[in-house]
Amino acid sequence: MSQSLFSLAFGVGTQNRQDAWLEVFYALPLLNPSAEIVAAVAPILGYSSGNQALAFTSQQAYQLADALKGIDAAQSALLSRLAESQKPLVATLLAEDAAPSSTPEAYLKLHLLSHRLVKPHGVNLSGIFPLLPNVAWTNIGAVDLAELAELQLEARLKGKLLEVFSVDKFPKMTDYVVPAGVRIADTARVRLGAYIGEGTTVMHEGFVNFNAGTEGPGMIEGRVSAGVFVGKGSDLGGGCSTMGTLSGGGNIVISVGEGCLIGANAGIGIPLGDRNIVEAGLYITAGTKVALLDEQNTLVKVVKARDLAGQPDLLFRRNSQNGAVECKTNKTAIELNEALHAHN
Protein backbone atom coordinates (compact mmCIF):
# COMPACT_ATOMS: atom_id res chain seq x y z
CA MET A 1 0.00 0.00 0.00
CA SER A 2 1.09 3.56 -0.64
CA GLN A 3 0.02 5.79 2.19
CA SER A 4 1.36 8.77 4.10
CA LEU A 5 1.28 8.85 7.89
CA PHE A 6 1.57 11.66 10.37
CA SER A 7 3.66 9.52 12.71
CA LEU A 8 4.89 5.97 13.22
CA ALA A 9 6.72 4.41 16.15
CA PHE A 10 7.64 0.99 17.48
CA GLY A 11 7.56 0.75 21.26
CA VAL A 12 7.94 -1.44 24.29
CA GLY A 13 5.80 -0.79 27.32
CA THR A 14 4.24 -1.87 30.57
CA GLN A 15 0.80 -3.37 31.08
CA ASN A 16 -1.06 -4.18 34.29
CA ARG A 17 -2.54 -7.59 35.08
CA GLN A 18 -5.63 -6.73 33.03
CA ASP A 19 -3.36 -6.07 30.01
CA ALA A 20 -4.14 -2.35 30.09
CA TRP A 21 -1.26 -0.12 29.02
CA LEU A 22 0.44 1.89 31.77
CA GLU A 23 3.18 3.45 29.62
CA VAL A 24 5.06 3.00 26.35
CA PHE A 25 8.68 3.77 25.47
CA TYR A 26 9.41 4.70 21.85
CA ALA A 27 13.14 4.84 21.21
CA LEU A 28 12.95 6.22 17.65
CA PRO A 29 9.60 7.83 16.85
CA LEU A 30 9.12 9.01 13.27
CA LEU A 31 7.31 12.12 12.08
CA ASN A 32 5.93 11.89 8.54
CA PRO A 33 7.57 8.53 7.72
CA SER A 34 8.16 7.79 4.06
CA ALA A 35 5.52 5.95 2.06
CA GLU A 36 8.14 3.25 1.48
CA ILE A 37 8.38 2.55 5.21
CA VAL A 38 4.59 2.46 5.58
CA ALA A 39 4.24 0.09 2.63
CA ALA A 40 6.83 -2.25 4.14
CA VAL A 41 5.34 -2.50 7.63
CA ALA A 42 1.59 -2.30 6.99
CA PRO A 43 1.09 -5.87 5.67
CA ILE A 44 3.08 -7.39 8.54
CA LEU A 45 1.10 -5.48 11.15
CA GLY A 46 -2.24 -5.88 9.40
CA TYR A 47 -2.65 -2.12 9.22
CA SER A 48 -5.05 -0.63 6.69
CA SER A 49 -5.94 2.91 7.69
CA GLY A 50 -6.62 5.38 10.49
CA ASN A 51 -4.92 5.88 13.83
CA GLN A 52 -4.12 2.55 15.46
CA ALA A 53 -1.99 1.04 18.20
CA LEU A 54 -1.24 -2.54 17.18
CA ALA A 55 0.38 -5.09 19.46
CA PHE A 56 2.96 -7.24 17.70
CA THR A 57 5.00 -10.32 18.54
CA SER A 58 8.72 -10.99 18.61
CA GLN A 59 8.32 -12.96 15.38
CA GLN A 60 6.66 -9.98 13.73
CA ALA A 61 9.46 -7.77 15.06
CA TYR A 62 12.00 -9.90 13.21
CA GLN A 63 9.87 -9.69 10.05
CA LEU A 64 9.60 -5.91 10.39
CA ALA A 65 13.35 -5.61 10.93
CA ASP A 66 14.01 -7.60 7.78
CA ALA A 67 11.47 -5.59 5.77
CA LEU A 68 13.08 -2.30 6.77
CA LYS A 69 16.71 -3.39 6.41
CA GLY A 70 17.21 -1.69 3.07
CA ILE A 71 14.86 1.21 3.79
CA ASP A 72 15.68 2.49 7.28
CA ALA A 73 18.69 0.92 8.98
CA ALA A 74 18.04 2.58 12.35
CA GLN A 75 14.44 1.35 12.58
CA SER A 76 15.52 -2.10 11.41
CA ALA A 77 18.17 -2.29 14.14
CA LEU A 78 15.65 -1.13 16.75
CA LEU A 79 13.16 -3.80 15.73
CA SER A 80 15.86 -6.47 15.97
CA ARG A 81 16.39 -5.38 19.58
CA LEU A 82 12.66 -5.24 20.30
CA ALA A 83 12.33 -8.82 19.07
CA GLU A 84 14.33 -9.89 22.14
CA SER A 85 11.98 -8.11 24.56
CA GLN A 86 10.23 -9.85 27.43
CA LYS A 87 7.82 -6.91 27.66
CA PRO A 88 4.82 -6.24 25.41
CA LEU A 89 5.46 -4.55 22.06
CA VAL A 90 3.25 -2.06 20.24
CA ALA A 91 3.36 -0.30 16.88
CA THR A 92 1.51 3.00 16.81
CA LEU A 93 0.53 4.37 13.42
CA LEU A 94 -1.12 7.77 13.15
CA ALA A 95 -2.62 8.58 9.78
CA GLU A 96 -3.53 12.07 10.98
CA ASP A 97 -2.89 14.36 13.90
CA ALA A 98 -6.24 13.74 15.58
CA ALA A 99 -7.00 13.67 19.30
CA PRO A 100 -5.38 10.55 20.81
CA SER A 101 -7.71 7.66 21.59
CA SER A 102 -5.42 5.24 23.44
CA THR A 103 -2.54 5.24 25.91
CA PRO A 104 0.05 4.23 23.26
CA GLU A 105 -1.15 7.10 21.04
CA ALA A 106 -0.95 9.57 23.92
CA TYR A 107 2.59 8.46 24.76
CA LEU A 108 3.65 8.80 21.13
CA LYS A 109 2.42 12.41 21.07
CA LEU A 110 4.45 13.15 24.22
CA HIS A 111 7.51 11.50 22.69
CA LEU A 112 7.22 13.63 19.55
CA LEU A 113 7.46 16.73 21.73
CA SER A 114 10.38 15.59 23.86
CA HIS A 115 12.28 14.28 20.81
CA ARG A 116 11.90 17.83 19.39
CA LEU A 117 10.02 16.54 16.36
CA VAL A 118 7.15 18.95 17.05
CA LYS A 119 6.98 22.09 19.18
CA PRO A 120 4.42 22.86 21.90
CA HIS A 121 0.97 23.41 20.37
CA GLY A 122 2.27 21.58 17.29
CA VAL A 123 0.40 18.36 18.01
CA ASN A 124 -3.20 17.57 19.00
CA LEU A 125 -3.34 16.58 22.68
CA SER A 126 -7.10 17.02 23.19
CA GLY A 127 -8.49 14.63 25.79
CA ILE A 128 -5.10 13.26 26.75
CA PHE A 129 -5.63 13.15 30.53
CA PRO A 130 -8.07 10.19 30.71
CA LEU A 131 -5.69 8.21 28.47
CA LEU A 132 -2.77 8.57 30.88
CA PRO A 133 -3.29 6.25 33.85
CA ASN A 134 -2.18 7.48 37.25
CA VAL A 135 0.61 5.07 38.16
CA ALA A 136 3.40 4.63 40.68
CA TRP A 137 6.78 5.37 39.09
CA THR A 138 9.21 3.11 40.91
CA ASN A 139 12.74 1.73 40.72
CA ILE A 140 11.31 -1.21 38.76
CA GLY A 141 9.28 0.98 36.41
CA ALA A 142 5.59 1.79 36.18
CA VAL A 143 3.31 -0.05 38.60
CA ASP A 144 -0.49 -0.08 38.64
CA LEU A 145 -1.64 1.49 41.91
CA ALA A 146 -3.97 -1.46 42.56
CA GLU A 147 -0.95 -3.79 42.39
CA LEU A 148 1.50 -1.61 44.32
CA ALA A 149 0.88 -2.79 47.90
CA GLU A 150 1.37 -6.44 46.98
CA LEU A 151 4.62 -5.70 45.16
CA GLN A 152 5.89 -3.60 48.08
CA LEU A 153 5.26 -6.49 50.47
CA GLU A 154 6.82 -8.96 48.06
CA ALA A 155 9.96 -6.84 47.83
CA ARG A 156 10.24 -6.52 51.63
CA LEU A 157 9.91 -10.26 52.10
CA LYS A 158 12.90 -10.66 49.79
CA GLY A 159 14.88 -8.11 51.79
CA LYS A 160 14.52 -5.50 49.07
CA LEU A 161 12.87 -2.09 48.79
CA LEU A 162 10.39 -1.01 46.14
CA GLU A 163 10.99 2.72 45.97
CA VAL A 164 8.19 4.95 44.70
CA PHE A 165 9.56 8.13 43.14
CA SER A 166 6.20 9.64 42.25
CA VAL A 167 2.52 8.90 41.75
CA ASP A 168 1.46 10.74 38.63
CA LYS A 169 0.05 10.53 35.12
CA PHE A 170 3.29 11.81 33.60
CA PRO A 171 6.74 10.24 33.98
CA LYS A 172 9.90 12.28 33.97
CA MET A 173 11.18 13.01 30.49
CA THR A 174 14.72 11.76 31.03
CA ASP A 175 13.52 8.18 31.59
CA TYR A 176 12.44 8.26 27.94
CA VAL A 177 14.76 10.68 26.14
CA VAL A 178 17.61 13.04 27.00
CA PRO A 179 17.76 15.64 24.21
CA ALA A 180 21.23 16.65 23.04
CA GLY A 181 22.88 19.73 24.49
CA VAL A 182 20.84 20.25 27.65
CA ARG A 183 21.48 20.33 31.40
CA ILE A 184 18.76 19.28 33.85
CA ALA A 185 19.79 19.53 37.50
CA ASP A 186 16.73 17.73 38.92
CA THR A 187 15.27 15.42 36.30
CA ALA A 188 12.03 14.87 38.24
CA ARG A 189 11.08 18.47 37.40
CA VAL A 190 10.80 17.95 33.64
CA ARG A 191 7.82 15.91 32.47
CA LEU A 192 7.63 13.72 29.40
CA GLY A 193 6.09 15.91 26.72
CA ALA A 194 8.36 18.86 27.48
CA TYR A 195 10.34 20.37 24.60
CA ILE A 196 13.82 21.27 25.86
CA GLY A 197 15.79 23.10 23.18
CA GLU A 198 19.54 22.75 22.73
CA GLY A 199 21.52 24.97 25.08
CA THR A 200 18.85 24.99 27.78
CA THR A 201 19.81 24.63 31.43
CA VAL A 202 17.05 23.70 33.87
CA MET A 203 18.26 24.32 37.41
CA HIS A 204 16.95 22.65 40.59
CA GLU A 205 14.10 25.14 41.06
CA GLY A 206 13.12 24.99 37.39
CA PHE A 207 10.10 23.04 36.18
CA VAL A 208 8.88 22.31 32.65
CA ASN A 209 5.43 20.82 32.08
CA PHE A 210 4.23 18.81 29.07
CA ASN A 211 3.35 20.69 25.86
CA ALA A 212 5.68 23.45 27.05
CA GLY A 213 9.34 24.20 26.73
CA THR A 214 12.22 26.27 25.48
CA GLU A 215 13.75 27.16 22.14
CA GLY A 216 17.19 27.31 23.77
CA PRO A 217 19.67 28.46 24.73
CA GLY A 218 18.36 29.72 28.04
CA MET A 219 18.37 29.37 31.80
CA ILE A 220 15.25 28.05 33.54
CA GLU A 221 15.06 28.51 37.30
CA GLY A 222 11.30 29.01 37.40
CA ARG A 223 8.12 27.30 36.26
CA VAL A 224 7.29 26.81 32.59
CA SER A 225 3.61 25.87 32.78
CA ALA A 226 1.70 23.72 30.29
CA GLY A 227 1.33 25.47 26.95
CA VAL A 228 4.11 28.01 27.55
CA PHE A 229 7.03 28.31 25.13
CA VAL A 230 10.17 30.30 25.96
CA GLY A 231 12.14 31.93 23.14
CA LYS A 232 15.89 31.67 22.64
CA GLY A 233 18.20 33.57 24.96
CA SER A 234 15.54 34.09 27.63
CA ASP A 235 16.12 33.47 31.34
CA LEU A 236 13.56 32.64 34.01
CA GLY A 237 14.78 33.62 37.49
CA GLY A 238 14.52 31.52 40.63
CA GLY A 239 10.97 30.71 41.68
CA CYS A 240 9.31 32.74 38.92
CA SER A 241 6.04 31.67 37.34
CA THR A 242 4.41 31.57 33.93
CA MET A 243 0.64 31.21 34.00
CA GLY A 244 -0.58 28.10 32.23
CA THR A 245 -3.84 27.42 30.42
CA LEU A 246 -4.87 24.31 32.39
CA SER A 247 -6.15 26.02 35.54
CA GLY A 248 -8.24 29.05 36.31
CA GLY A 249 -10.22 28.85 33.10
CA GLY A 250 -7.58 30.80 31.21
CA ASN A 251 -7.50 30.53 27.45
CA ILE A 252 -4.70 32.99 26.69
CA VAL A 253 -1.62 31.18 25.40
CA ILE A 254 1.32 32.53 27.36
CA SER A 255 4.70 32.74 25.65
CA VAL A 256 8.04 34.37 26.36
CA GLY A 257 9.84 36.09 23.49
CA GLU A 258 13.55 36.07 22.72
CA GLY A 259 16.10 37.70 25.02
CA CYS A 260 13.70 38.13 27.95
CA LEU A 261 14.37 38.10 31.68
CA ILE A 262 11.73 37.25 34.26
CA GLY A 263 13.18 38.09 37.67
CA ALA A 264 13.21 35.84 40.73
CA ASN A 265 9.74 35.24 42.22
CA ALA A 266 8.12 37.28 39.43
CA GLY A 267 5.34 36.02 37.21
CA ILE A 268 3.50 36.65 33.97
CA GLY A 269 -0.10 36.16 32.89
CA ILE A 270 0.43 37.77 29.47
CA PRO A 271 2.62 36.82 26.51
CA LEU A 272 5.91 38.71 26.50
CA GLY A 273 7.45 40.17 23.36
CA ASP A 274 11.17 40.08 22.62
CA ARG A 275 13.65 41.65 25.05
CA ASN A 276 11.15 42.17 27.87
CA ILE A 277 12.24 42.39 31.51
CA VAL A 278 9.99 41.76 34.51
CA GLU A 279 11.38 43.00 37.81
CA ALA A 280 11.96 40.44 40.57
CA GLY A 281 8.89 39.84 42.70
CA LEU A 282 6.44 41.46 40.28
CA TYR A 283 3.50 39.34 39.09
CA ILE A 284 1.71 40.72 36.05
CA THR A 285 -1.76 39.39 35.25
CA ALA A 286 -3.78 40.34 32.18
CA GLY A 287 -5.87 42.82 34.17
CA THR A 288 -3.01 44.50 36.03
CA LYS A 289 -3.17 48.29 35.64
CA VAL A 290 0.16 49.49 34.26
CA ALA A 291 1.44 53.07 34.14
CA LEU A 292 3.09 53.43 30.74
CA LEU A 293 6.14 55.71 30.78
CA ASP A 294 7.99 57.09 27.78
CA GLU A 295 11.76 57.50 27.44
CA GLN A 296 11.57 60.71 29.53
CA ASN A 297 9.78 58.84 32.38
CA THR A 298 6.64 60.84 31.59
CA LEU A 299 3.29 59.11 32.12
CA VAL A 300 1.68 58.45 28.74
CA LYS A 301 -1.41 56.60 29.93
CA VAL A 302 -2.57 53.81 32.22
CA VAL A 303 -3.40 50.58 30.42
CA LYS A 304 -4.17 46.97 31.28
CA ALA A 305 -1.21 44.64 30.97
CA ARG A 306 -3.00 42.65 28.24
CA ASP A 307 -2.71 45.73 26.00
CA LEU A 308 1.07 45.35 26.18
CA ALA A 309 1.08 41.64 25.34
CA GLY A 310 3.68 40.72 22.75
CA GLN A 311 5.22 44.20 22.57
CA PRO A 312 9.05 44.25 22.39
CA ASP A 313 11.58 46.13 24.53
CA LEU A 314 9.55 46.65 27.70
CA LEU A 315 10.66 46.85 31.32
CA PHE A 316 7.98 46.06 33.90
CA ARG A 317 8.70 47.30 37.42
CA ARG A 318 6.97 48.29 40.63
CA ASN A 319 7.39 51.85 41.94
CA SER A 320 8.93 51.35 45.37
CA GLN A 321 7.39 54.58 46.70
CA ASN A 322 3.76 54.27 45.67
CA GLY A 323 3.48 50.60 44.66
CA ALA A 324 2.25 51.35 41.13
CA VAL A 325 3.16 48.91 38.38
CA GLU A 326 5.08 50.79 35.70
CA CYS A 327 6.24 49.93 32.21
CA LYS A 328 9.33 51.69 30.93
CA THR A 329 10.29 51.71 27.28
CA ASN A 330 12.86 53.32 25.04
CA LYS A 331 10.13 54.65 22.76
CA THR A 332 8.68 58.17 22.64
CA ALA A 333 5.12 58.90 23.75
CA ILE A 334 3.99 59.19 20.11
CA GLU A 335 5.56 55.84 19.17
CA LEU A 336 3.99 54.23 22.22
CA ASN A 337 0.50 55.41 21.33
CA GLU A 338 0.93 54.23 17.74
CA ALA A 339 2.08 50.81 18.93
CA LEU A 340 -0.89 50.51 21.30
CA HIS A 341 -3.41 51.44 18.61
CA ALA A 342 -1.81 49.05 16.12
CA HIS A 343 -2.00 46.27 18.71
CA ASN A 344 -5.69 46.88 19.33
Curated annotation (Swiss-Prot):
One of the GO BP terms on file: lysine biosynthetic process via diaminopimelate
Annotated signal peptide: none
Organism annotation: Pseudomonas paraeruginosa (strain DSM 24068 / PA7) (Pseudomonas aeruginosa (strain PA7))
Organism superkingdom: Bacteria
Active site: E221 (acyl-anhydride intermediate)
Subunit structure of this chain's protein: Homotrimer.
Reactions it catalyzes: (S)-2,3,4,5-tetrahydrodipicolinate + succinyl-CoA + H2O = (S)-2-succinylamino-6-oxoheptanedioate + CoA
HAMAP family reported in the protein's UniProt record: DapD_type2
Function, as annotated: Catalyzes the conversion of the cyclic tetrahydrodipicolinate (THDP) into the acyclic N-succinyl-L-2-amino-6-oxopimelate using succinyl-CoA.
Compartment(s) of residence: Cytoplasm
GO CC annotations on file: cytoplasm
Keywords: Acyltransferase, Amino-acid biosynthesis, Cytoplasm, Diaminopimelate biosynthesis, Lysine biosynthesis, Magnesium, Metal-binding, Transferase
GO molecular function: 2,3,4,5-tetrahydropyridine-2,6-dicarboxylate N-succinyltransferase activity; magnesium ion binding
E.C. no: 2.3.1.117
Residues engaged in binding succinyl-CoA: R223, G238, S241, A264, E279, A280, G287, K304, R317, R318, N319, S320
Family according to the record: Belongs to the type 2 tetrahydrodipicolinate N-succinyltransferase family.
Main location: cytoplasm
Binding-site list for Mg(2+): E205
One protein family per Pfam: THDPS_N
Broad EC category: transferase
Record protein name field: 2,3,4,5-tetrahydropyridine-2,6-dicarboxylate N-succinyltransferase
Pathway this chain belongs to: Amino-acid biosynthesis; L-lysine biosynthesis via DAP pathway; LL-2,6-diaminopimelate from (S)-tetrahydrodipicolinate (succinylase route): step 1/3
